[in-house]
UniProtKB/Swiss-Prot annotation:
CDD domains: CBS_pair_CorC_HlyC_assoc. Plays a role in the transport of magnesium and cobalt ions. This is Magnesium and cobalt efflux protein CorC. PANTHER family: HEMOLYSIN-RELATED, MAGNESIUM AND COBALT EFFLUX PROTEIN CORC. The keyword Repeat applies. Residues 72-131, 137-194 form the CBS domain. Belongs to the UPF0053 family. The keyword rRNA processing does not apply. One of its GO terms (cellular component) is plasma membrane.
Amino acid sequence: MSNKDTQGTDKINRKGFFSILLNQIFHDEPKNREELLVLIRDSEQNELIDQDTCDMLEGVMHIAKKRIKDIMIPRTQMITLKLNYNLNKCLDIIIESAHSRFPVMSRDQNYVEGFLIAKDLLPFMKHPEDAFCIKNILRSAVVVPESKSVDTMLKEFRLKRSHMAIVIDEFGAVSGLVTIEDILELIVGEIQDEYDDEEKVNIRKLKKCIFSIKALTEIKEFNDTFETNFSDEEVDTIGGLVMKAFGHLPSRGDHININGYNFKVSIADSRKVIQIHVTVPENKIPKKLEK
């Protein structure tokens, strides 16, 4: 038998196998998506498929209805670099955020020039005397509309071998970003990597008295951690507290003393404060944080 005949037989066998499998699971052909979902759940109840398989099948069914706008990281939460940043400034933000890919914004912050992958900075760390120009190591950015369907986006990620895309609104303005991980998590559930635990922690100890705080950390969490009593009547987050104390949007490196605690902006852009370093008075560090 020729290879061509063998391949044809294999295809028939595979088709027959899946037909038998589907017939065993779905005795009655579903008429619509809702009936199909019911049959999938019934199959799990009858132990024809396990819980994980059921969840993944449901996830695949649901992503067809979703748009990129539903799952994207909004622009206000994007951590970005600027085209005019030097090597040290890029490294500071990369180390502070622990991300691996960064949108690089134009000088006026109106559009994305491309993506920077953290590993592309390694040669410059070994040879810092080499001239560094962020534009020379940029990767091209995939740009998609908010209205794009999630399942189509997944296919595009696969075809273009890309992991991240910039999302724009109907007027062409940047509204957020989406990653392949965001989509896969809709199917298989949350994906843990070596940085996930660190990224989810809002308050991280750097030195004996210095802590890194995400600006979106709620004041209540800050108070519970440091046994303080900052008011959350007018603002909800530490970033809001710092901006209120400054009376304007502070820049990276700006610092201010609030009730004996020194708040220094470690990451910020033209729209928001992203990360803050807090120096706690030595005599006010709770015992649970002394280790």
